[in-house]
């Protein structure tokens, strides 16, 4: 979908704040399912313009755009690598919505594969270390000092609130998607989570979506994080939820396939079944390569960095997979309703969400140990 923006109006607005320039361009970035990003060139400077999506999988699942601006502003004087913010605009008449502009950082995001320069055991080891060390920095932020002490509203009930919110998201999506297939396994996961919410021992800043494809690694070697991106789900809460989310994406060779026999039997004739292998089997599979930390090693490093003990692993990783399933079911509803910013991958969610349900059950049943 092409985003229509009055570029002349935007140019005038920016000129008043950044100074006049003869060179100006605005292009849409691909990827992402939440806030939209556009590449902005202003003279010799390059920026990223962030704006809300035309439609969301469920508005209550994502925090406001200006919250993201607020946290990036607060983190500029910390050890957490983030893009510097430039300006925020609450005047919707400029581009048709609120927006903010931030520094555009260069490098590579690791999603389906790793760049050639990182394809050695030494660089892979650094990727794991950098990823965990940066997460530890996020969880060590003094929120009072940076002005974020009232950033979240869930209090000590963060985990219970997450389970309730995600279950509500799934139920909302199923109002439209239930006619396509049943998701009893996902609701069983929701019940298990509700019955097994642990007591949170720590309350810190949490990113909410911390994983490799939201981390920009700088160009060159050694592997080094240039910036942590996509803070729209950040809040104050249980830091172990961030770690569990990261671990749910970090695959190992011993992990069973989430494409179980019953999934294959039910969907093997589906037009999108070949794509399921890419998303369910190949996504982040490179973390199985020689040199990458195992999940247990990541946990050990995190515990040493933060002093937090990672307990209740099955709950936190299952919560991570369930969170992804609930969000993906929202994307599937968007596809069925032909929402304005529906992406090409959204039809696949018909198959992906039941598969995620099986993956969560594998964690609960101990088939995918830490």
Regions found by a protein language model. Give the residues of each.
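Active-site activation/catalytic loop segments of kinase-like enzymes and analogous catalytic loops
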Residues: 241-306, 321-337
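Juxta-kinase regulatory segment immediately upstream of eukaryotic protein kinase catalytic domains
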Residues: 1-24
């Amino acid at each position: 979908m092409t985003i229509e923006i009055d570029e002349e109006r935007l140019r005038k607005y920016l000129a008043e704040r950044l100074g006049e320039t003869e060179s100006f361009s605005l292009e849409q970035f691909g990827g992402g399912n939440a806030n939209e990003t556009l590449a902005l060139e202003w003279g010799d400077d390059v920026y990223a313009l962030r704006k809300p999506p035309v439609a969301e999988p469920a508005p209550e699942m994502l925090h406001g755009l200006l919250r993201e601006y607020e946290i990036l502003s607060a983190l500029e004087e910390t050890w957490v690598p983030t893009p510097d913010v430039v300006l925020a605009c609450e005047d919707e008449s400029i581009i048709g919505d609120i927006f903010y502009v931030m520094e555009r950082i260069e490098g590579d995001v690791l999603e389906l594969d790793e760049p050639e320069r990182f394809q050695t055991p030494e660089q892979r080891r650094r990727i794991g270390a950098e990823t965990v060390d940066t997460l530890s920095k996020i969880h060590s932020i003094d929120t009072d000092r940076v002005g974020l002490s009232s950033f979240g509203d869930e209090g000590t009930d963060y985990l219970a609130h997450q389970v309730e919110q995600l279950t509500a998201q799934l139920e909302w999506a199923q109002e439209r998607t239930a006619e396509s297939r049943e998701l009893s396994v996902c609701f069983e996961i929701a019940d298990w989570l509700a019955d097994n919410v642990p007591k949170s021992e720590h309350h810190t800043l949490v990113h909410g979506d911390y994983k490799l494809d939201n981390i920009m690694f700088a160009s060159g070697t050694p592997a080094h994080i240039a910036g942590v991106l996509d803070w729209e789900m950040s809040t104050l809460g249980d830091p172990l939820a961030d770690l569990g989310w990261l671990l749910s994406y970090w695959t190992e060779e011993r992990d069973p396939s989430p494409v179980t026999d019953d999934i294959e039997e039910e969907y093997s004739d589906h037009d999108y079944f070949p794509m399921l292998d890419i998303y369910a089997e190949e996504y982040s599979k490179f973390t199985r390569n020689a040199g990458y930390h195992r999940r247990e090693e990541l946990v050990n490093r995190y515990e040493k960095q933060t002093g937090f003990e990672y307990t209740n692993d099955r709950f936190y990783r299952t919560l991570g997979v369930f969170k992804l399933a609930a969000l993906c079911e929202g994307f599937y509803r968007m596809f069925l309703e032909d929402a304005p910013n529906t992406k090409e991958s959204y039809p696949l969610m018909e198959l992906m969400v039941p598969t995620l349900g099986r993956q969560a059950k594998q964690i609960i049943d101990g088939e995918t140990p830490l």
